Amino acid sequence: MKNGKYLILCVDDDGDILEALRLRLNKAGYLTETALSAEEGLKKFKENQPDLIIADLMMEEIDSGTGLVKELKLAGNRAPVLLLSSLGDSLTVSASTRELGLDAVFQKPVNFEAMLKTIRAKLGQKG
């Protein structure tokens, strides 16, 4: 938490999606850090210690979003992690969620209101 606001790290190799997430999350009252790669996301995680992380499943580096989640765990992450996916059926996504210890997986295009509800719940907020 910085300046009384929760900090959310968003990691996606699509700049348009990152900007949309940043704008929507800022409007909802959250501070955001963004990263265009898994490697940059890991660096920003170490620098900022965010309260929650949102990452894309399909990124080029560190074996995509799942690799990032594994690297975050090795770096001591205890923040909730939400994964964004444009691939896979619910069974595959469900298996990945259990295996990686993810807090939630959202299919693209993301229903932002549903994601916001999950973010609030994971951060222990009401509303």
Question: Which sequence ranges carry the predicted segments?
Answer:
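Non-catalytic signal-transmission and effector/linker regions of two-component phosphorelay proteins
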Residues: 1-7, 113-127
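Conserved acidic segment of CheY-like receiver
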Residues: 5-16, 21-25
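Conserved sequence signature across two-component system core domains
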Residues: 11-12, 35, 53
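Helix N-cap/capping motif at the beta->alpha junctions
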Residues: 34-43, 64-65
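Conserved phosphotransfer cores of two-component systems
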Residues: 46-48, 71-78, 100
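Active-site residues of response regulator receiver
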Residues: 56-57
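Alpha4 helix (beta4-alpha4-beta5 surface) of REC/receiver domains from two-component response regulators
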Residues: 63-67, 74, 88-106, 114-117
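Hydrophobic/aromatic residues positioned on beta-strands within the core alpha/beta folds
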Residues: 84-85
